[in-house]
Design a protein with these regions (language model features):
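Small-residue-rich hydrophobic transmembrane alpha-helices
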Residues: 51-111, 148-167, 263, 275-335, ...
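N-terminal transmembrane alpha-helices
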Residues: 6-38, 42-46, 59-74, 78, ...
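Transmembrane helical elements of multi-pass membrane transporters/channels
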Residues: 17-36, 140, 174, 203-207, ...
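Transmembrane alpha-helix boundary and packing residues in multipass membrane permease domains
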Residues: 22, 26, 38, 77, ...
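Short alpha-helical transmembrane segments in multi-pass integral membrane proteins
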Residues: 1-19, 79-144, 188-245, 303-368, ...
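Small-residue hotspots at the loop-to-helix junctions and early N-terminal turns
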Residues: 48-59, 134, 138, 197, ...
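Helix-terminus/linker motif at the lipid-water interface of multi-pass membrane proteins
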Residues: 27, 31-52, 121-128, 184-191, ...
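Short runs within selected transmembrane alpha-helices of multi-pass transporters and secretion channels
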Residues: 69-72, 141-159, 167-178, 196-211, ...
Length: 455
């Protein structure tokens, strides 16, 4: 089974070897999610309303993803750093501490979701019409909480061991299954939006089974339940995992918060049609960002492993490659968004009324998108090098202290209406992205230079 050697070979090849399988997997996963929404949007008579209803479920789905990232993104870099140091025992304990916390959190989240689904959806801006479709979709989706979290949260530990192809396959299995099952459950079995949720849950179960099969039976370091006599040691590791993972967790959680705020303001200023517009914009953003996340996640284990091995030259090279690849890709996609927004929106809906409102909203939302790259690059470096404070601070800064206040101030304070909601994003990209990137340069480079001089 081919494995990436993060300490040897060219840095660019290491990153590409890790990033390309992730890119394939994430594109398939994106295609799966997009197909889900495309089919839902084309359900006869209720498509646009049903699409908006799914968008109302996004905050809860984001919260589940946030907890997956708390343990996956928090544990995998520390896992890689310890592998770089040659400390396999600590790496093993970190992975299994993350697994135990992940499973416990999944049970709690599923229970809370079942108990409070209806009031939460109402809080998120669901009208009575939208609630008819959002509630059953969410109740079925919640059944897949544990497999969803295992598939998402434990996959980074596969990639961190250098098995990028296996990581890709675990995502691919679920994505392909969802693409096949969606039309069967939605149209052939005439289950509508409930069918879309059932197809999603089945696909998540398949992905989780493959992840668990590999980590439990085939990988060098195997996933297992922690023993009673390991609890005290695992408590210390749990604090480290949660501390580092809080950055990604906060980013996902604040995405959910922003989604709630946007839906509430859009519901008041534009009605249900603008919630559907935001759902499409979120889908386009997910599509555009997929390769960026693949590059970031492909670079992360290279950064972490070589930082643990005290190879600052390779850490610097990985950072430069990350910056170049992300900025070139985003420059191309940014141009496509501004030149041909109708094409991107048309992928998700053919509703002419929706298209009329969505085109200017999309252009406004992505007006300064390239600055968002600076945030992603900085966050990836901070997380990979176990810089907890910086990672957490910049996760909070952009979303909580810039986007959320602007989402209310621009529409109501400056009377910009729905445009104000979409304008909040580019303003936050410029401010938050620039500050994060500059801070990374002035704090990380001196440390790496010092590490190099001490070798």
């Amino acid at each position: 089974m081919k494995r990436i050697d993060f300490e040897n070979g060219t840095v660019t090849n290491n990153i590409l070897s890790a990033a390309l399988p992730m890119l394939v997997a994430q594109i398939l996963n994106l295609l799966s999610n997009s197909v889900d929404r495309i089919y839902i949007a084309r359900i006869h008579d209720i498509g646009t309303t049903a699409l908006g209803a799914v968008g109302l479920c996004f905050p809860i789905i984001m919260i589940i993803t946030a907890f997956s990232n708390l343990f996956g993104s928090g544990g995998a870099p520390i896992f890689s750093i310890n592998r770089g140091k040659g400390d396999s025992r600590t790496a093993d304990m970190i992975m299994n501490t993350a697994f135990t916390m992940l499973c416990g959190s999944a049970a709690v989240l599923m229970l809370i979701g079942f108990l409070f689904a209806r009031p939460l959806l109402t809080l998120f801006g669901a009208s009575d019409d939208a609630l008819v479709y959002a509630y059953p979709y969410l109740m079925i989706y919640l059944l897949g909480t544990l497999p969803s979290m295992i598939a998402t949260g434990m996959n980074p530990f596969i990639n961190a061991q250098g098995y990028a192809i296996i990581g890709m396959l675990s995502v691919t299995v679920g994505a392909v299954a969802n693409i096949i099952l969606d039309p069967i459950f939605i149209f052939v079995l005439d289950m509508g939006i409930k069918g879309a949720a059932i197809a999603t849950v089945i696909s998540q179960i398949l992905s989780a089974l493959l992840v668990f099969y590999f980590l439990h039976g085939k990988s060098e370091l195997k996933v297992r339940w922690i023993h009673i006599n390991e609890i005290s040691e695992c408590t210390r590791h749990a604090r480290d995992i949660i501390s580092l993972g809080s950055a990604g967790f906060i980013m996902q959680l604040t995405n959910s918060l922003v989604s709630i705020c946007c839906n509430n303001v859009l519901s008041m200023t534009g009605g249900d049609i603008y919630i559907s517009v935001m759902t499409i914009i979120s889908s386009v953003r997910q599509m555009v960002e997929t390769p960026i996340h693949a590059i970031n996640e492909g670079t992360s284990p290279v950064l972490s492993y070589n930082y643990g091995a005290r190879r600052p030259d390779r850490v610097k090279k990985a950072g430069v490659v990350l910056i170049i690849m992300v900025l070139i890709y985003t420059g191309i996609m940014w141009s496509v968004i501004l030149i041909a927004p109708e094409f991107l929106i048309g992928i998700f809906s053919s509703d002419k009324l929706l298209l009329k409102d969505a085109v200017p909203a999309l252009k406004l939302y992505f007006a300064a998108f390239i600055f968002m790259d600076l945030q992603y690059i900085g966050q990836t470096v901070f997380k990979s090098l176990n810089k907890k404070k910086q990672a957490i601070f910049f996760s909070l800064l952009r979303k909580v202290f810039i986007v959320v206040p602007l989402t209310y101030f621009l529409p109501y304070g400056l009377h910009m209406g729905t445009d104000g909601v979409f304008m909040a994003e580019p303003v936050s990209n410029v401010i938050g992205g620039s500050l994060c990137f500059i801070t990374m340069l002035v704090t990380i480079l001196p440390e790496l230079n010092k590490m190099g001089n001490s070798r």
